[in-house]
Design a protein with these regions (language model features):
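C-terminal binding/interaction regions
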Residues: 1-76, 81-167
């Protein structure tokens, strides 16, 4: 089956997907990425009279999720119910994991990915002096739950793990 792009109309022109007829349901998505660095989480410890970089990264992620439609063309403006940003040590650096939940007519995959990317950028900015060759890697959607296409992703158990036919 040939895949069709959801944001391209029959005449080949870009369009915002019309979600008017979709049901309002609970939707969630989880994304992750790695900030690959030789520095450890100790490099993120706040110094005296400085803002905590972990808190700053969480705020950056939440703010970015809320503004996804301003940052990514053709994304719908959504009222989000919850945005969670977690930073954990990883053998290659720091893992950023985000979960976004909303009760809407469309999914929150882009919001989860955007939150993850911006939280990682905030950490990257903090690490520039400690590790100027740090990089952001493996930005990926781990799962999405809800909506017409059902549950799918790398972490979805007992579900069709293939993405929907529209991309």
């Amino acid at each position: 089956m040939e895949r069709e792009f959801s944001h391209i109309n029959a005449m080949g022109k870009l369009r915002m997907v019309d979600v008017t007829s979709k049901r309002i349901t609970r939707r969630s998505a989880m994304a992750r990425c790695l900030v690959v660095t030789s520095a450890d989480m100790g490099a993120l410890e706040p110094r005296e009279d400085e803002i905590d970089p972990v808190i700053c990264a969480r705020i950056a992620g939440v703010s970015a999720a809320k503004r996804t439609s301003e940052l990514i063309p053709l994304c719908h403006t959504l009222n989000l119910n919850d945005v969670n940003v977690e930073l954990t040590p990883h053998d290659r650096g720091i893992e950023v994991t985000t979960t976004v939940t909303a009760t809407q007519r469309t999914g929150v995959e882009m919001e989860a990915l955007t939150a993850c990317a911006f939280a990682a950028l905030s950490i990257f900015n903090t690490l520039l002096l400690a590790d100027p060759i740090a990089l952001i890697d493996e930005l990926e959607l781990l799962k999405k739950v809800g909506g017409k296409s059902g549950n799918w992703g790398r972490l979805v158990e007992d579900a069709d793990k293939k993405p929907p036919t529209s991309v």
